[in-house]
Amino acid sequence: MNSGEISIVFSGGGTGGHIYPAVAVADYLKKRYNNLNIVFIGTNEGLESKIVPQHGYKIEYIQAKGLKRSLTVKNVEVFLKFISGYRQALQILKRIKPKVVFVTGGYVSLPVALAARRLKIKTILHEQNAYPGLANKIISRFCEKILISFEESKRFFKNSNKVVLTGNPVRLEIFSHNERAAKSSLGLEDKIIVLAVGGSRGAENLNKAVIRLSKEFEGCKDVYFILSSGDTKYLEAVNFANSLGVKSNIKILPYISDMPRYLAAADIVISRAGAIAISEITALGKPSIIVPSPYVANNHQEYNAKALEKVGACFVVLESELESDKLKSFLEKLIYDKALYERMSESSKKMGKPEATQNIGKIFEEYLSL
């Protein structure tokens, strides 16, 4: 470490939902300070091993594995890896000597936070979802600050005096397009665009529901569907569309690499309820129909979706309801009821926290100046 250099450690991983917010904060701080040494701690099995280096940051690896919810002998291996990871985190933190540790959840963050506590290093916790994960619940008991993305999260943390509602950081590129230019770039200036996204891996039931929906709206020439099916579900989705004879009013893509442009162009979004998706949709004030995934830990996506629904920022359709008329009914309301559309757009904007990264950056500055 150079003289005058300040080190910060970020840790969180497993999924993009834990990693991208940390990267967004790191990017913000890097622009504000020219004397920062930013280091991530993760596992070489999680997505952080790809995402962090792609963004130009150093990453150090420790051993860690997620706890199995049921009683199983595999948890012995989890415990042994945890002990090993804790010791590795201690060695890394002793060497780097960070002024602050910022953890965003996932099983890798717990040994890092505990090591920071042992070394009396200030720790800031960020929770992206309405329902906190197990690691974050434990870390919240001893960290200095608990930053949340949803007001509803506050009730799950006992130390409410440490809780600050900041929102979930989103990448700056999300704000780089205006709606008219984005629509024009897609050749869809005169269309009501319904963007449907089932996550990076796709969602078979959601894909089929959206394709059936596009078939029912074929007579409505103003409405155009764009479906991001997921790489592994792409051929299946195309074949299903062909079997229904759907062609003219839907574009099926395996993956959307330029999501900021497509999201800007969209009038209505149909999406899962992952933390990043919710944050980006609301940051742009998009009315949405949210279909929470039932295949996630603690059913946290449904908590996220209900938090939006509570303030009128979205409609919620459960996975089990996809074959009902609910999805079609909600879409018709958003297309044909302009007053409802405007109200939901306004509620979405109020729910969104486009300034989340700056909010977190200001809290960091308090600790960096100590």
Swiss-Prot record:
Primary localization: membrane
Membrane topology annotation: Peripheral membrane protein
Places the protein is found: Cell membrane
GO cellular component: plasma membrane
GO molecular function: UDP-N-acetyl-D-glucosamine:N-acetylmuramoyl-L-alanyl-D-glutamyl-meso-2,6-diaminopimelyl-D-alanyl-D-alanine-diphosphoundecaprenol 4-beta-N-acetylglucosaminlytransferase activity; undecaprenyldiphospho-muramoylpentapeptide beta-N-acetylglucosaminyltransferase activity
Pathway: Cell wall biogenesis; peptidoglycan biosynthesis
Single GO biological process annotation from the record: cell division
Enzyme class, UniProt record, top EC level: transferase
Coiled coil: none
Keyword Glycosyltransferase among UniProt keywords: yes
Keywords, comma-separated and alphabetical: Cell cycle, Cell division, Cell membrane, Cell shape, Cell wall biogenesis/degradation, Glycosyltransferase, Membrane, Peptidoglycan synthesis, Transferase
Residues that hold UDP-N-acetyl-alpha-D-glucosamine according to the record: 15-17, 129, 171, 200, 256, 301
Catalyzed reactions: di-trans,octa-cis-undecaprenyl diphospho-N-acetyl-alpha-D-muramoyl-L-alanyl-D-glutamyl-meso-2,6-diaminopimeloyl-D-alanyl-D-alanine + UDP-N-acetyl-alpha-D-glucosamine = di-trans,octa-cis-undecaprenyl diphospho-[N-acetyl-alpha-D-glucosaminyl-(1->4)]-N-acetyl-alpha-D-muramoyl-L-alanyl-D-glutamyl-meso-2,6-diaminopimeloyl-D-alanyl-D-alanine + UDP + H(+)
Enzyme Commission no: 2.4.1.227
Cited NCBIfam families: murG
Sequence similarity: Belongs to the glycosyltransferase 28 family. MurG subfamily.
PANTHER family tied to this protein: GLYCOSYLTRANSFERASE, UDP-N-ACETYLGLUCOSAMINE--N-ACETYLMURAMYL-(PENTAPEPTIDE) PYROPHOSPHORYL-UNDECAPRENOL N-ACETYLGLUCOSAMINE TRANSFERASE 1
Matching HAMAP family: MurG
Role according to the record: Cell wall formation. Catalyzes the transfer of a GlcNAc subunit on undecaprenyl-pyrophosphoryl-MurNAc-pentapeptide (lipid intermediate I) to form undecaprenyl-pyrophosphoryl-MurNAc-(pentapeptide)GlcNAc (lipid intermediate II).
Name used for this protein in its record: UDP-N-acetylglucosamine--N-acetylmuramyl-(pentapeptide) pyrophosphoryl-undecaprenol N-acetylglucosamine transferase
Gene source species: Caldicellulosiruptor saccharolyticus (strain ATCC 43494 / DSM 8903 / Tp8T 6331)
Annotated gene: murG
